[in-house]
């Protein structure tokens, strides 16, 4: 078996954050070392030439466990220029997603030449609990062709001092959940069922379980692993919207991690990230039914209807009660969505388009990226 791991990162601040926190967590015994003991591992890093030295000296530890390849933006074509030139002439607030998409496509094109290969797409600030990568491999050995998981976003300014005091010691899952609970970013906090300032774009709904953890229902988990298929390479949106569902056509081939005990990971973002967001409506059944019609595909239901348990301390009775409530809530959302679709007039061109996006194959899904390209021609 083979694994080809992807990350794209550039600039001193971001590279040093990657090696100090993300890479340090990945070098825990149950992560890359466990993977490299049972499979061939290539770790492909996309960056610019000016950033190459910032990976030192920590990258030498990774080279003992995996083949490490650097691919430079200066050597990649984007339209009629080098990708590095496109980066320098683009809006810095949105360029990361474009770079990630283009470089991950390049990574997948390189990997498709290898047999028995699985792709692992990582963000440069993913911090994993020890044993996470081993669990991904365990599920692949059992026959799963893809692995999905959802991260907890942390406030960078608060979490970094804590993580710095702990790493490179391996992080336990419960330890990382507690860090997530105590230093959670305002963005996921706005997605709790009882949030005082609800999100305008509720991609997940979270439920507190006292001080023992929380439960999350999520539409768009991250594609942590998938076996290569030609249909995946030319995805258009950000990778969490469609890659997993292009990777597997049969839901049983996909493993969705529903317990932090098996795999836990966090992402660190500045507190100012999405800091100017306005408050949305409370996530009532009707609000969420409209959200699923206009912002998801029916196959995302696979994730949303299966709550994820983030466990900091045991309380089986409390977790089961919240999970039952979360499942009932999700079931009601989709029932209401069916009723709303039945009420809309068939001649409505806008509704017809979104009904196809929601009910059709994943290739028909109008993601935010596709919507932004089509907004001038979409029916009003």
Predicted regions: what they are:
Residues 85-87, 91-97, 103, 107-108, ...:
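Conserved catalytic core of nucleotide-sugar-dependent glycosyltransferases
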Residues 7-9, 13-22, 28, 86, ...:
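Secretory-pathway lumenal glyco-enzymes, predominantly type II signal-anchor Golgi glycosyltransferases
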Residues 214-365:
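Long C-terminal appendages of very large multidomain proteins
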Residues 46-117:
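Active-site-proximal specificity loops/subdomain of glycosyltransferases
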Residues 112-129:
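Short beta-strand-to-loop acidic/aromatic patch adjacent to the donor-nucleotide binding site
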Residues 357, 362-380:
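Boundary detector for helix-to-coil junctions that initiate low-complexity/charged tails
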Residues 10-12, 50-52, 125-127, 152-155:
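Short, solvent-exposed loop/turn segments at secondary-structure junctions
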Residues 1-78:
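N-terminal anchoring/stem segment of glycosyltransferases
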